[in-house]
Curated annotation (Swiss-Prot):
GO molecular function: 3-methyl-2-oxobutanoate hydroxymethyltransferase activity; magnesium ion binding
Protein name stated in the entry: 3-methyl-2-oxobutanoate hydroxymethyltransferase
Pfam families: Pantoate_transf
Keywords: Cytoplasm, Magnesium, Metal-binding, Pantothenate biosynthesis, Transferase
Residues that hold 3-methyl-2-oxobutanoate according to the record: 53-54, 92, 122
Amino acid sequence: MAGYISDDTRKVTTHRLVEMKQRGERISMLTSYDYTMAQIVDGAGMDVILVGDSASNVMAGNVTTLPITLDQMIYHAKSVVRGVKRAMVVVDMPFGSYQGNEMEGLASAIRIMKESHADALKLEGGEEIIDTVKRIISAGIPVMGHLGLMPQSINKYGTYTVRAKDDSEAEKLIRDAHLLEEAGCFAIVLEKIPATLAERVASELTIPIIGIGAGGHVDGQVLVIQDMLGMNNGFRPRFLRRYADLYTVMTDAISRYVSDVKNCDFPNEKEQY
């Protein structure tokens, strides 16, 4: 079945995302970490490309997102920005780059923006980081919030289970979402929370709510690209829809290349100078 390709070549901005919510148009968002993949994702009509700290997992093989550094995030962000013409590029601020105090967070934010030429940043947390969020936004840097399951806090929670299932945590999430909007965030990611709660947040806020494992009654969806392309063979969470099985496709292609080299079938006469 043919996919969706936008004929609108205008650069996606924070204002356009808000307009999309207002007219009921869903926002598409995927991760990318390198130039080649970013070109493909942008060319396919993606609205937002997230240079996620999930690069720590899918690119570097770490168990959590915690080890990735500011320098490494800037490297990935630079590579992605070079490959993008239309999509908005949002960069995750890595663990340790903004949790200390607001001035350290601002310095990290300015460095990412100056060196990568990205369009916006994403931070995990609510009330506990609100002063940092305000400081970054006051410097003219657009900020996307992130609530619910927050992978940078995995050592606090101990598990990647669904968050905000009890009333107290759900009410805190709602309060935090309003605080982030009031602080000036242009959008919020809600990760792995009950669909009814995500729907409530999306209905109460005027800014876009992007879900990952947060149901279908939000303003957009985000996934890790390796997951939706089926490159991580053993990763099959309930919220994931796999649009390809690239693990099998790539393994087959590589094994055929190995076979051709071993059997002296590659290169042939037409593939030589």
